[in-house]
Amino acid sequence: MLEYVTEAIVLDKVDLGELDSRVYLFTRDFGKITAKIKSGRKIISKLASHTEPLNLVTVRIVDKNSPQLIDALISKKGIPGKTFFKIAALVRDISPEGQSDRNLWELLISLIGNGAEAGDFIKVLKILGFDPARAKCNNCLKGSPDFFSIKDLIFYCKTCYAG
């Protein structure tokens, strides 16, 4: 059984069963971690408010068979916004599990303090290896694509983008 204490940004939290939750974290030391919160949806759960998306938290995770978040303390609340939620979803879906990335961590920390703008989404794409400046539309091979599909990991131009 391993125990980790580290700073993390809460990317997302989803319901798991009747009372449990699954939380997606991006940590300074271990990169992306998906952990279970036992009884995290109970009305008396002390972890429920600490593990809301976009919070900067100090977490304690125990890894026996699978990671379980057992303690969390808010350091800073993120400034919510549509762009920040898109960035959190991008990091949740694309970044590899268990691989630390200092550049991405530093960018996400700055976004928590200052809020996110549209250009920050492109910065995250670059850090994750999807630089739009070097990409082409997947369908027509036109340079300078306008859209990125998180689901397919593909760039599209305005003409070819289906939504």
Language-model segments: residues:
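Non-catalytic alpha-helical scaffolds and adjoining flexible linkers that form interface surfaces
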Residues: 1-21, 26-163
